Amino acid sequence: MTFNSFEGSKTCVPADINKEEEFVEEFNRLKTFANFPSGSPVSASTLARAGFLYTGEGDTVRCFSCHAAVDRWQYGDSAVGRHRKVSPNCRFINGFYLENSATQSTNSGIQNGQYKVENYLGSRDHFALDRPSETHADYLLRTGQVVDISDTIYPRNPAMYSEEARLKSFQNWPDYAHLTPRELASAGLYYTGIGDQVQCFCCGGKLKNWEPCDRAWSEHRRHFPNCFFVLGRNLNIRSESDAVSSDRNFPNSTNLPRNPSMADYEARIFTFGTWIYSVNKEQLARAGFYALGEGDKVKCFHCGGGLTDWKPSEDPWEQHAKWYPGCKYLLEQKGQEYINNIHLTHSLEECLVRTTEKTPSLTRRIDDTIFQNPMVQEAIRMGFSFKDIKKIMEEKIQISGSNYKSLEVLVADLVNAQKDSMQDESSQTSLQKEISTEEQLRRLQEEKLCKICMDRNIAIVFVPCGHLVTCKQCAEAVDKCPMCYTVITFKQKIFMS
């Protein structure tokens, strides 16, 4: 699978706007904001949701549909409001893409204003069904209207609301399939009985042809970002008689804990007794787990998810998010952004560690996965190239098996890599010009010195320009970069070896 967004059937979009198809998808618009000013009062995601693309100049954005440009954003600005003000007849703001797809799909016999979409991925035919380019809820949210999705639309299959019910659908799951039924069911998916094809009980989206490095939750979110289950919204399924029956049979399908007696931290920590295993029992208890008394097996009191065979370096919260991302306790404690980031990181790690031959489609997938990482986007804003970031991330994952956990460490390694590269280039140049060893050493030492005091080593990267020129003490006294005179919005401390 690649990170390319879905494109609707061309019959759903008039010929005169075919060139706009690429940016009908919100994430394709968001990708243009890689170098958008990080200090903007209005976030890149908000602007992309309102139909804007980044122009690359200041904070100026432009609508992909009407091409109206807006800049000089202020705190409290409404992206949709300003868009509507400058271009009240914009097709995007007025729901043209949503309404057009609904009209076409109705004509083709598909209910609820939804049409078939496919993702062409070279040799891959991983696909999705029943997803419009913009969901009705997203349109109402964007235009400021009240979101009112009737229970007859969501979820698509109330009988599969509970994870247990979805898990039972995998009785004939093929042996060749790469993902486990438990992981798929946890991501809201149930087996359709055809090949390795699964379907979301909520949005109705279908996925198949799974690859070894795929993660169910990541792919669900990537292909169906507006799914209410993915977004963690309340589905209000209790109004459905089928759902009530399902709730009685499967208590875990509600927001209530699977094991209420273990809802308190003290109760969970008590179960660990004389815990002798490598993972800290306090961390396990805080992450919602209690001990089962069988080796290092633990179970979450809320979702009922179990884990075992712990490694010393594993973090309980991360493992909880990796294997049971739909857990309500996890969502309440850590938030959806944390869960998403964990899946982005693990998806990249497993692709790089397990795959020996990188096909063009897999390379694109890895690139897109790296690009989604918030740390990567911040490093790009600081002036580092995507090529250098990708290279150093791949090296770290191949060596250690894990990705970077903090921006500070990533930036430090990038700076050190640049320094090593500069040393190599300097060494080659010195040999060509027959410069003495003493001269080479002097130059390298000067490169590390603060360009203001020429006494202490450089230790601060200026954002957004990315220049590395001063020590910590001298950096405190400047508001503009001494190299390019750009106003400094943030000063990132780094460590040089």
From Swiss-Prot:
- This protein is called E3 ubiquitin-protein ligase XIAP
What are the EC numbers?
2.3.2.27
Q: Which Pfam families match?
A: BIR, UBA_BIRC2-3, zf-C3HC4_3
Indicate yes or no for the key word Zinc: yes
Subunit architecture: Monomer, and homodimer. Part of a complex composed of SEPTIN4 isoform ARTS, XIAP and BCL2, within the complex interacts with SEPTIN4 isoform ARTS and BCL2, SEPTIN4 isoform ARTS acts as a scaffold protein and stabilizes the complex. Interacts (via BIR3 domain) with DIABLO/SMAC; the interaction inhibits apoptotic suppressor activity. Interacts with HTRA2/PRSS25; the interaction inhibits apoptotic suppressor activity. Interacts with TAB1/MAP3K7IP1 and AIFM1. Interaction with DIABLO/SMAC hinders binding of TAB1/MAP3K7IP1 and AIFM1. Interacts with TCF25 and COMMD1.
The organism encoding this protein is Homo sapiens
* Effect seen on changing V86E: Loss of dimerization. Reduces activation of NF-kappa-B
Q: Per UniProt, what does mutating W310R do?
A: Reduced interaction with HTRA2
Q: Which family does it belong to?
A: Belongs to the IAP family.
Stretches for region Required for interaction with DIABLO: 329-350
Q: Where are the zinc fingers (RING-type)?
A: 450-485
Write out the GO cellular component annotations: cytoplasm; cytosol; nucleoplasm; nucleus
Keyword annotations for this protein, in alphabetical order, are: Apoptosis, Cytoplasm, Isopeptide bond, Metal-binding, Nucleus, Phosphoprotein, Protease inhibitor, Repeat, S-nitrosylation, Thiol protease inhibitor, Transferase, Ubl conjugation, Ubl conjugation pathway, Wnt signaling pathway, Zinc, Zinc-finger
